[in-house]
């Protein structure tokens, strides 16, 4: 079993979880092919982490299965947006932590 972690990525964890659920339990090669044609930013980021997990184990992509793809919430980046009459509104930009584990197919 090998794993890869990407932390503090500027990405909404809610949107990333939608992609992560789709590839869990899939063959890594199929998952990478599927992620390549998804139009989301999260798909591109998760594809890189999956490829890294496969490479960390020294495996070939067609011989491993994604056992777990977990997305956790990171800290929010706090920003301010100027508003009318000298006021300001707080903007919260979410970050995410991505954990991917792959295991050799048996």
Swiss-Prot record:
Domain of life: Bacteria
Keyword RNA-binding included in the entry's annotation: yes
Keyword field contains Ribosomal protein: yes
InterPro entries in the cross-refs: Ribosomal_uL22, Ribosomal_uL22_bac/chlpt-type, Ribosomal_uL22_bac/org-type, Ribosomal_uL22_sf
GO molecular function, one term: structural constituent of ribosome
Keywords: Ribonucleoprotein, Ribosomal protein, RNA-binding, rRNA-binding
Bridged cysteine pairs (disulfide): none
UniProt-listed Gene3D superfamilies: Ribosomal protein L22/L17 (3.90.470.10)
Gene Ontology biological process terms in this record: translation
GO CC entries: cytosolic large ribosomal subunit
Pfam family, one: Ribosomal_L22
CDD domains in alphabetical order: Ribosomal_L22 (cd00336)
General function of this protein: This protein binds specifically to 23S rRNA; its binding is stimulated by other ribosomal proteins, e.g. L4, L17, and L20. It is important during the early stages of 50S assembly. It makes multiple contacts with different domains of the 23S rRNA in the assembled 50S subunit and ribosome.
Family label: Belongs to the universal ribosomal protein uL22 family.
HAMAP family: Ribosomal_uL22_B
Quaternary organization: Part of the 50S ribosomal subunit.
Protein name, UniProt field: Large ribosomal subunit protein uL22
Record gene name: rplV
């Amino acid at each position: 079993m090998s794993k890869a972690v990407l932390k503090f990525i500027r990405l909404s964890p809610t949107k990333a979880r939608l992609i992560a659920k789709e590839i869990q339990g899939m063959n890594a090669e199929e998952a990478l092919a599927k992620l390549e044609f998804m139009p989301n930013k999260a798909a591109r980021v998760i594809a890189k982490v999956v490829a890294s997990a496969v490479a960390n184990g020294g495996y070939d992509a067609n011989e491993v299965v994604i056992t777990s793809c977990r997305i956790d919430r990171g800290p929010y980046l706090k920003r301010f947006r100027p508003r009318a009459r000298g006021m300001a509104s707080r903007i919260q930009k979410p970050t995410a932590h991505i954990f991917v584990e792959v295991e050799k197919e048996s």
